[in-house]
């Protein structure tokens, strides 16, 4: 499975998307540092908003196969400069988040991501789950099983063996 790093400003939905993709309950949690979750790298928004911290994002991008630029559908402006993806030596995809919100304008956010240079753009809602499977399918490679699905299967198999032994 391709490894992805999520980048975007604070509160654009990076951690919520990480939780939704992993099948966890989505709950607000402020990301304080760069977190690795199997094939997902979740980053604090301050790293994208501060040019001194942004260097760390550039370095961490080397640990991924794909860079995901996240932009909330409720944003009044874009964090990403036009054609900024040309500086990346990784594939950069756009992810429009919070499409379920009443004040959402996903078309505007998608246009901004395309101006930044994202060729592929996904629309997602971590709250409703809409679009999550599309990103997972995109990241999957032939024969892949999601790491957290594999863990669940192993736990189920282990529990079944315990039940069989006690019977």
Show where each model-derived region lies:
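Conserved G1/Walker A P-loop phosphate-binding module
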Residues: 1-43
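Short alpha-helical
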Residues: 12, 48, 130
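Switch II of P-loop NTPase G domains
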Residues: 22, 41-86, 103
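Short secondary-structure boundary/capping segments
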Residues: 30-32, 59, 84-85, 113
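Loop/turn-to-beta-strand initiation segments
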Residues: 37-38, 65-66, 91-93
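Conserved C-terminal guanine-recognition region of P-loop GTPase G domains, centered on the G4
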Residues: 69-123, 138
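Canonical P-loop GTPase G-domain recognition
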Residues: 102-163, 167
């Amino acid at each position: 499975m391709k490894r992805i790093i999520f980048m975007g400003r604070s509160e654009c939905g990076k951690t919520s998307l990480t939780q939704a993709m992993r099948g966890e309950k989505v709950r607000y949690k402020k990301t304080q540092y760069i977190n690795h979750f199997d094939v997902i790298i979740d980053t604090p928004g301050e790293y994208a908003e501060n040019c001194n911290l942004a260097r760390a994002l550039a370095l961490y991008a080397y640990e991924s196969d794909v860079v995901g630029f996240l932009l909330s559908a409720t944003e009044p402006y874009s964090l990403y400069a036009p054609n900024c993806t040309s500086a990346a030596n990784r594939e950069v995809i756009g992810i429009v988040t919070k499409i379920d919100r009443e004040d959402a304008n996903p078309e505007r956010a998608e246009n901004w991501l395309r101006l930044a240079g994202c060729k592929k753009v996904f629309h997602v809602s971590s709250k409703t789950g809409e679009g999550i499977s599309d990103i997972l399918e995109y990241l999957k490679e032939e024969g892949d099983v999601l790491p957290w699905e594999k863990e669940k299967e192993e736990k189920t198999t282990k529990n079944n063996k315990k039940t069989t032994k006690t019977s």
